[in-house]
Structure formats: structure tokens, C-alpha cells
A protein has these predicted regions:
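Structural beta-alpha unit
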Residues: 1-6, 19, 26, 45-48, ...
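Small/aliphatic-rich secondary-structure junction motif
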Residues: 2-60, 157-205, 224-227, 231
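General small-molecule cofactor/ligand-binding pocket signal
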Residues: 39-41, 90-94, 145, 185-187, ...
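Short, well-ordered secondary-structure micro-motifs
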Residues: 50-52, 127-128, 171, 196-200, ...
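A short acidic, glycine-rich active-site loop
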Residues: 59-72, 203-214
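Glycine-rich, Arg-bearing micro-motifs that act as flexible, cationic patches
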Residues: 113-135, 154-155, 256-282, 296-297
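Short beta-strand elements of ligand-binding domains
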Residues: 115-118, 144-149, 287-291
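Short, structured interface segments
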Residues: 131-150
Length: 299
């Protein structure tokens, strides 16, 4: 597997709330490691044209509220300078719906990665995909890094969920390109049809053997050298993918989960219940979502 150049431009989608602080820190860490330009994008809700004192355009200057675009831009610059005054950054603030604003800004800047945070349910004390993140992973033609963990250090471990398809092969290649120093674990979950009517142990062994052979072929087709492939941990497990991955994430070292989307996949509104989407929502740590290669060609 040939290591390509790092992306030269990434974007961070932020709502300026504390929920996005972890995504902010991760974006800075990645931008420094890749020596990439970082564009911070924030979408503002449209302002009301009428105030208690009349229409904004008709008010004297001292009665007009501060320019919200300039205020948001100044806040972002202050935060970035406080974190690292030397990083190459751009700030894009625009009025509009968040997902379209982010996607269009990413397209215009030729970004190769979108970094974003997640919403939080304070009552249930769990992190979950918000509407904006959900729309980003449906419509983006570039990978989206969903950040839940604190960004203490670079990713050391990477878990690639695979069904041995072209989509998951591209996801693996993307993960290796982005984070070449991370160790790789390959994860495949399978179900045994008619398990109650068959000799379960024997059938499961057959599926295990198939999974190991398929994993070897998968890594070879991804362009991974034999010596590198031997260093990849294989997990061929029986069960529901998102349940197994969530359990593994909660009981193992911190890692980045990498998942590819299929054809229509989670891009298709009708397939929101797909395995990929369930994995993204279930895994408690960071997730790199790599769009289906056919979608990139179409765009």
C-alpha cells in the first residue's frame, strides 16, 4: 500500500459551543501533523431585521447590535491565536443552514477532510449525532472525522470495520493515508443463517475460516505489502456489528474507528438504518467516515 501525501487542506465545522472544543483540538493536532491549512467554518442563523427600536437599516449606529459575522470571526481568531499563533488558518463565517454552508465552503477550498463534533443529550449523558453532523455524513464527498474523545495525542490505534467491499477497502486506504503510524485492526462481523437448525460450532468455524481468507485477500487488494499485512490484527466475530464494536470500544484502548459508506449507503435518505450509520452512532469514540468511491466519481 503506497503512502500518499497528506491532505493539504482540512476544515473544522463548529457551532462555537463547548461541544465542539474536542473537535477543535483534534483539528489543530491534525493540521499541525499534516502541515495543512485549516479553515474554521461557522454558520450563523439569520438575524431579525426588526428590533424593539425599529428596522436595523434605519437605526442610528449606536443602536445597532454588533455585526454577528464579525463578532463570530473575532472570537474564532482569538481562540486560535491562544492555542497556536503559528498555525495556517482561515476563518469562514456565513449566514445560513450549517450543513450546506460547511459543504460549500469545503468544496470551494478543496478540503480533503471535514472535522466536526457531536451533540450531547444532557439527560441521558451520552454523545449522539446531531442533525448537522447527520447531514454532513450523508452528503459529503470527502471523509468526515467525527470527534468524541479528547485530543491528547495522535491516533495510535485504528479499527477498520469491513464487509470486504470496495467501499471498506477505500476506507482502509484512506485511514492508512491519513494516519500511517497507527496500528491497524480489521473487524468483520457475520451472522450465521439458520443457526438453530445447523451444527452451530461447525458452521461458525466455516465462517471464521472464510473470514480469515477474505481478510487476507482484502488486505492484498488494498495494496498492503505481505509484511505489513501480517502486522494487522484480524477480528472475525459473530454478532451484530454495531453492538460488537461498541462493546469493543468500551473495553479496549482508545482508537479511531474507520467505516466506509456504500453506494446509496447513508447518503440515501431511505437507508439511514444501514449498518454504517448504526456503527457511527453506536461507537463511543472518534469515527472516520469515508464516503463511497462511486459518490466521489459522480461528483
Amino acid at each position: 500500500m503506497t503512502q500518499g501525501p497528506f491532505p493539504k487542506h482540512i476544515v473544522l465545522a463548529t457551532d462555537l459551543s463547548h461541544r465542539c472544543d474536542r473537535a477543535f483540538d483534534r483539528a489543530l493536532l491534525v493540521a499541525k501533523a499534516w502541515q495543512a491549512e485549516l479553515t474554521v467554518i461557522h454558520a450563523l442563523a439569520p438575524t431579525e431585521d426588526v428590533t424593539l427600536f425599529g428596522r436595523l437599516g434605519e437605526l442610528p449606529s449606536w443602536r445597532r447590535p454588533p455585526d454577528p459575522v464579525g463578532k463570530a470571526r473575532d472570537r474564532i481568531y482569538r481562540d486560535l491565536v491562544r492555542e497556536d499563533p503559528n498555525i495556517d488558518i482561515a476563518v469562514h463565517v456565513e449566514t445560513g443552514s450549517p450543513a450546506p454552508v460547511v459543504l460549500e465552503a469545503a468544496r470551494q477550498s478543496r478540503a480533503e477532510l471535514i472535522v466536526t463534533g457531536v451533540a450531547r443529550d444532557e439527560l441521558l449523558a451520552r454523545m449522539f449525532l446531531g442533525d448537522t453532523v447527520d447531514r454532513l455524513i450523508r452528503k459529503s464527498t470527502v471523509p468526515v472525522l467525527i470527534v468524541r474523545d479528547r485530543a491528547f495525542e495522535p491516533y495510535h490505534n485504528m479499527l477498520v470495520a469491513t464487509d470486504f467491499s470496495e467501499s471498506s477497502r477505500v476506507a482502509l486506504q484512506t485511514g492508512v493515508r491519513f494516519f500511517p503510524d497507527a496500528s491497524i485492526s480489521l473487524f468483520h462481523a457475520y451472522d450465521v443463517p439458520f443457526a438453530g437448525y445447523l451444527g452451530r460450532a461447525e458452521v461458525e468455524k466455516q465462517f471464521q475460516d472464510y473470514g480469515k481468507d477474505a481478510a487476507d485477500k482484502f488486505l492484498a487488494e488494498a495494496g498492503m505489502a505481505p509484511e505489513s499485512a501480517r502486522g494487522v490484527s484480524r477480528m472475525i466475530e459473530h454478532g451484530v456489528p454495531e453492538v460488537l464494536l461498541r462493546d469493543y470500544a468500551e473495553n479496549s484502548r482508545r482508537h479511531l474507528t474507520v467505516v466506509g459508506t456504500h453506494g446509496g449507503g447513508i447518503v440515501n435518505q431511505a437507508l439511514i438504518g444501514s449498518t454504517a450509520c448504526k456503527i457511527i452512532d453506536a461507537v463511543p469514540g472518534d469515527v472516520l467516515v469515508v464516503p463511497d468511491p462511486a459518490k466521489r466519481k459522480a461528483d
